[in-house]
Amino acid sequence: MTGDGVEQACGECATTLEPWEGQPAPRLYGFTARHVAQALVMVACGQSYRRTAATIRQVTGRPLDDRPRRSATGQVLAPAQQHGQLVSDWVEVFAPIIWSAYASARWPQWLLIDDTSFRITKPGRPRGEEAFSVLGAVGYGPDERPQLIAVEAVPVVDSAAWQAFLRSLKGTPGLVVGAGGLPLATADRVFARRRPPPELRRCQWHLARNLTKSLPDAVQRDRTDEIHRLIAAAQSSAPAWEQLTAEILRRTSTGGYLAALKMVTSLRPVVAHQLAQPLLGPRSVGPLEQFFRELSASLGPRASKMTNKVRADALLKLLAADRNGWTDEHAWADLIRTHLHRQQGHARQQREHTDSSGSPSLRRLPKPVPIDA
């Protein structure tokens, strides 16, 4: 009892209770909201579903057989204790609830957009084949700190995917920074009729990389060559850009710089336009690229098993939440309890978004072969 006579229950203590008693938990679940939150935090921090499931079963006193199993064909299977379906179901059901409690529903003033792809091994293909891609957006709030504001897995990166992604939130950003190509072109189409339309800015790091890759191979490897300093400074002012152009033009007479000359010529109007714009806001998609590198380390080894779009999106939201510094076991447990209270204790039905056999939602489906009549 509190001082004003209101009865309270501790949501964190875990005493041994009768089967009809216990801590707040989703109906028909054998685990409490606190344990679900603990599992979600572990997954957000990069733990696998299997390791998380084994830990949760152990700490709750619900261990399963920890001996390796074999299938009917003799294939070695993971122990039942490590079966990850338990945690995978929780991620699908509760990750969107956690994300919606923190993430903004509107685009911020400054926005970074880009995509990255995940590949899987394929016999006969040295680089494997593309499994799926991830679209990402980092926004800058009033404190000018970058935060992931949207992330989505797609089977293929095309204009339709980017249009749906950029229309997923309300509002219009004031500045959109991208590597160029499809993301910025689609942003121009989506936001062009908004008033005022956003400024579109090419990422300076990608522009510099394009220039560097156009150099002869030996010059690319020689980081002491003066031209690398000129490239680094080229986007700071019009005279710096002209100095780089003059140096490339001078070297063209010796051979091997034709590609660099074409590149610096084609990028000149882009750089000139950006130099004429206000200097406010980010100039690189670096914060988003950093998140993509972390994703590659976390999801790369299991990309071949990620075939369901809804579940992949839920996992991405947890990983993004951790990147934003939102992971908090106690706060997440409170969010889950509040959600369950509103739903009379019922969590959303698990496995609502299963794929039909042979039609994984996170894979590019093969084009149908025309049949002659």
Which residues does each PLM region occupy?
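Short helix/loop capping segments that flank catalytic or ligand/cofactor-binding pockets
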Residues: 18-21, 51, 120-122, 185-187, ...
